[in-house]
């Protein structure tokens, strides 16, 4: 595969359905992880769509529903059906249609399969598709995907308690303006809500320690054991 990013303008395609996005992501993933079984049969493709691990959300699609999604992707030239087997087998054509290098395809596939993620999460979760040297290289390809015409990914605003922005793909449609990261926002700033979340967690842990100490004293009393040594440090 060509690994040189292609930032040229590409024809727009309609927004994919959630299941179409899942089918496309599964085909790209399995090409790398189970090459001996690729292209995939309808049964294998359905199992990949309904996989419990590495998927968000988890689905329970039928073969008929997956086949409908495949037909939709075939009309967009994103999926092709092989003709060399008695059992229909399907393969993706995403890289060529969208003009993606292998690095960008790995990131987009991981977003299709697992939903919004930070650059660090994407580096970890896409490792079997492409090994990124560091988070900076992940961010560089994300920025290029976001700069494509049309854009393929977008950076999301941080939610309360998050320290890093997450990214999401746009193949299934746009996201609302309230979800987008604001230009000029300080990347290293920690929102006040994050500190409040830490305070709440500290209080929860303190309450839990107090509860456990009470349980220890009660059990010690029932067993006739002096619990003084066990709780001596509770006021430290």
From Swiss-Prot:
This is UPF0502 protein Bxeno_B1639. SUPFAM superfamilies: Winged helix' DNA-binding domain. Belongs to the UPF0502 family.
């Amino acid at each position: 595969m060509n690994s040189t990013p292609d930032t040229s303008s590409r024809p727009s395609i309609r927004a994919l359905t959630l299941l179409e996005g899942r089918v496309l992501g599964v085909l790209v993933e399995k090409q790398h992880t189970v090459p001996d079984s690729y292209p995939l049969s309808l049964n294998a493709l359905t199992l990949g769509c309904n996989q419990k691990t590495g998927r968000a959300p988890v689905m329970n699609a039928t073969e008929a529903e997956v086949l409908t999604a495949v037909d939709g992707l075939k009309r967009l030239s994103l999926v092709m059906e092989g003709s060399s087997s008695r059992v229909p087998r399907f393969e993706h054509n995403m890289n060529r249609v969208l003009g993606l290098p292998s690095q960008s395809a790995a990131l987009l596939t991981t977003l299709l399969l697992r939903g919004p993620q930070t650059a660090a999460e994407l580096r970890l979760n896409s490792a079997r598709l492409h090994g990124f040297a560091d988070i900076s290289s992940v961010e560089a390809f994300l920025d290029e995907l976001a700069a494509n015409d049309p854009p393929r990914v977008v950076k999301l605003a941080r939610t309360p308690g998050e320290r890093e922005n997450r990214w999401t793909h746009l193949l299934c449609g746009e996201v609302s303006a309230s979800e987008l990261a604001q230009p000029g926002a300080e990347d290293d700033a920690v929102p006040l809500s994050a500190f409040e979340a830490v305070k709440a967690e500290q209080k929860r842990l303190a309450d839990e320690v107090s509860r456990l100490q009470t349980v220890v004293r009660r059990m010690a009393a029932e067993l006739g054991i002096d619990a003084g040594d066990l709780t001596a440090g509770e006021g430290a």
